[in-house]
Amino acid sequence: MTDVNKTQIIDYDGHIIDNLKEWMNNNKLSKLGFNYNVIAILGSQSSGKSTLLNNLFKTSFDVMNTKLGHSQTTQGLWLSYDKFEDELTDASNEETDVEPQNKSNNKHVINPTLILDVEGNDSKERGENRLTFEHRSALFSLALADCVIVNLWYHSLGNFTASNYGLLKTVMEVHLELFHQNVNCPKTILLFTVRDWFEEFAPLDIIREKIVDEYVNKIWCELKKSENSKNANIDDYFIIEVVGLSHGIIKKDEFLKDIKRLRHKWIYELRPINYSRNIPADGFAQYCNNIWNTIIKQSQLDIPSQQEMLATFRCQEIKNNVLNHISNTIKEKMVDSKNKYIENFKTWAEKDIIEKSLNEYLTDAARYQKIICLKTLEELLENLFIQLQIIVDNNLNFTQRILSSKFSKELNSMYSICTTDKSYFLFINDQNVDVTEQDENLSNVENIGENSKKGNQIKCINLWSNFLYNADMLEYTTIANFFDQYKKCSVEIIEPSISNNEDKDSQEKRNHDFNYKNSLTILATSIYKDTNRIRSVQCNILIERIRSTIKEELKNVDNMLITVKCSKDCWDYILKIVNKLEDYIYTNLSKCFINLKTGINTTYLNNGDNIYARLNTNCDYGLGYFQNEQITDFSDDAGKNDDEMDTEIDQNKNDMESLFNSKKFEIITKQNKKEKYVSTINNDLNKEMNNKKLISELKKFYTEIIIDALKIKLDEISNNIANIIINRFESVFNYDEIDQPRQWRNISAIELKNIFRVSKDYAFLIIEILQKNIKIDKIDNYLSTNFINTDIIEKGKIKAKKRIQEICRDAQYIQETGGHMSLKNVPFAFWVILLILGWNEILMFTRLFFRLNIILPMLIGFIIIVISCLYTGNAQILSYINKIIFIVIKNLYNFYKHLQTIGHQTTKPEKVE
């Protein structure tokens, strides 16, 4: 049956067995920290080492059965432990001669001791190879043990081999080899147990003197020492203790008493308070592994390096265990963060994650080297921060999506009136618009004529003139709100302390700021895209309203074409309209275009650190990225789709410092926000209005818009050339010099012919006028001569001639006949016959109407509606009814007048002499 209280750690062949850590965990030894000790025993084979340990520490190492003969019993190295549980219940020490020097510190707790039973030396089984294993086991024991028991027989004192002189020399050489470089190395207790000692043979002091002088000091003098330890004394490295033990068989009772004294001496006098090798219990197994592997490889065994190696290994192991324990909590919160905003993240991260992880880590890791412990702790924190960063990113992504949507809605809402009101500008027929300059408010136009079209127009112009200012201030507010939310994600860390006695309030604190760049980049890019999108939409609306205004103004050209008599007058009139439109647009809308139009070559704005420059250049991180480029292309680039914007965004990658202008970013990120951000965009815009080059380019741009609208108008005129010719013809043919209708029955055929010829020439003169065969400044740069297509002219001529001939034939008919077409000429008999033949139909219609009871309900319903409206005072419905009655009566009257006109035209003409 296997004894669970002991385990083999090194087998006979010198291989380390890997179950030591499991054995220590099973026996609850791993949680001891430094509160344990290690004792090893060295001595000749079959010298009673295991028997001594079993009696001294209540262990169960295998012992030799002498009845079966002498043989090797302990093979390799074995480990057991003693928790001294019996001593905790034994309150009396009267039977001991030992004064418990360290008992006051361990009144209720006695640190357990790990006991290392080492294979005996001078073994015939190992033969010639024994020295190698003996040296290795001695080296291993000294690296681990607080105390090394050298077991020897009294009757062997004076012998070389039997007295373990060679073993002792090996021990001292190995110890010097291990600790000669370490000035503050722990002293190893060399406990000589003299077996089968009798007081009658020699006092213990004599034996002690003999061992110290003839063995220890002699060997120490013979050792080759390094420069560091050349002048060192044996007492600098060892504590020498000698005890005598009575014969275990002859004087068994005395032997047991000696054992008990030695046990108490170890517990209360010799035993260090903590493990002198400064290796925590949870790292002891790994430390043994490292030491033995280094010895086997015949490498230089450096204890500090081994301790550092162990500290690194154990701290990493503890760190990984902590991460494994806490990762599930973080992962659960991570899953939640994908679906919702994590409230109270700061408190949760500080208390439930960081503080809990640090406490769990330092509970075990604080026992190892401070530098390595703290270094690994920083790695632990870094790993936690990496995992928490994902939750922070999710939180900030929720924040940026909300802020991005809010930015877009607010900017859209601010310009909703401009989007809904698409009427043409009224300033064409009025004085110049006085645009209110915007100061710090996002919209300073609330008191301007809300219900009037003129008031809405001024409000729109004011908003457009301050678009960049509004966007800049709204951007500042949005980013400031983002950082307010971001600060809720920063965590405060109490600087870790290895000392358990340090008060938390006295410990230094530091903040960890998570990375916000990704979320801020997305937000800035979204702001950039939304601003450019809304800017593009508003620019298109502005241009469309200008075009509708130009179109409205060009309607006057239709009337001019009827009366114009020469090409110069026609084109001078058109040029006057163009100049008038250009002046009005420049005076009232230039600031709007500088705000809304991309690609305008400015001086102050493009070279400054402001939103305009960033919007007019290739932006990667939204409004903040600025390249000092100037764009002079005046093509219609007001609208760009998202794909085009994404292409621009992917073209440049820059640092976060170029996200926003430095002044704005500095104010936002300051802890003390006493300073207020003031946008300088409007000041720069006002400076730009004095830029002659900009004025020239703006006027050129306005001219292009006007000429484009003029071309469209001229195309309409070209397509309507036939009707224009006909209208010009009728204006001369049907009316005399004083604009009175001509009485064709009073005009002779020759006069009619002359009037027709003059009217026709006047009508077709418009073709030559529209061909622009003269030079007109400004218009010549955009419109060539003979711009009307020949085919259109020919088709218009054919259509116009046909209609002109019809008009002329009607006039000739009236001139020749002078007849009147009237209902009065219809015979009475016709109406009688119509009534007789249609009588059945009239009756059928009347019967159907009354059978369906339509007339009476309609009449009653109409009366009820009128009465209810009068009673309730609903003037709007009464107004509608009044309008309907008026329209019906008016149409009946017009129909009557039309019949009268036809009757007069068909009267019989008088004879012309």
Swiss-Prot record:
GO terms for molecular function: GTP binding; GTPase activity. GTP binds at residues 43-50. Belongs to the TRAFAC class dynamin-like GTPase superfamily. GB1/RHD3 GTPase family. RHD3 subfamily. It is an enzyme of class 3 (hydrolase). One of its GO terms (biological process) is endoplasmic reticulum membrane fusion. Gene3D superfamilies: P-loop containing nucleotide triphosphate hydrolases (3.40.50.300). The chain crosses the membrane at residues 826-846, 850-870. It comes from Plasmodium berghei (strain Anka). Keywords: Endoplasmic reticulum, GTP-binding, Hydrolase, Membrane, Nucleotide-binding, Transmembrane, Transmembrane helix. CDD domains: GBP. One of its GO terms (cellular component) is endoplasmic reticulum membrane. Residues 33-288 form the GB1/RHD3-type G domain. It is a multi-pass membrane protein. The keyword Transmembrane applies. This is Protein SEY1 homolog.
